[in-house]
Amino acid sequence: MAKVYGKRLFMNRRMLFKLSIAGLVVRAQPIAAKEEASEFPFQLSKSEWKARLTPFEFAVMREEATERAFTSPLNSNYENGTYHCKGCDQELYRSLHKFDSGTGWPSFWKEIDGAVGTRKDRKFFMIRTECHCSNCGSHLGHIFDDGPQPTGKRHCINGVSLVFYKA
């Protein structure tokens, strides 16, 4: 009987562990989608976003996926100009604030004032700062504290979320 009890206890612990992990995965789902309807001035329905964006753009900008490093042509672009949100065309970053972070994503040490919103991102068992367009809520990337002065910030941005306009 002791062996059966021990197996049941082990099975119960294993089940509790699986349920805990499942709860964390559900909790890690994008929060921005829930907040969009009331938070951002520019709004579209899910079907309108899908019509406006390619499937990959939709995955990154509306579902917080990440493009592979070194795949965006904007990563190596250093022409003078402005980077806009692909979702709503709001100005987000100036080329003056772009730098080569070596990470494989377009990186900026400063955004255009008021153009980028942030929130805590607790996915993948860590806390990061997610950044999004303040006008439409489209996911841009994350902000880290390892950038150059004067801000010390690195806005690590998915190039697929941006459109570049030459000055």
At which residue positions do the language-model features occur?
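N-terminal secretory signal peptides
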Residues: 1-11, 22
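Short, non-ligating residues that shape and space the ligands of small metal-coordination modules
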Residues: 94-95, 142-143, 165
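C-terminal segment of N-terminal export signals and the immediately downstream linker at the start
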Residues: 28-63, 68
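Residues immediately within or flanking Cys/His clusters that coordinate Zn2+
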Residues: 82, 128-130, 153
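Short linker/helix segments within small regulatory modules
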Residues: 146-151
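Mid-length scaffold segments of soluble, non-membrane domains
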Residues: 76-107
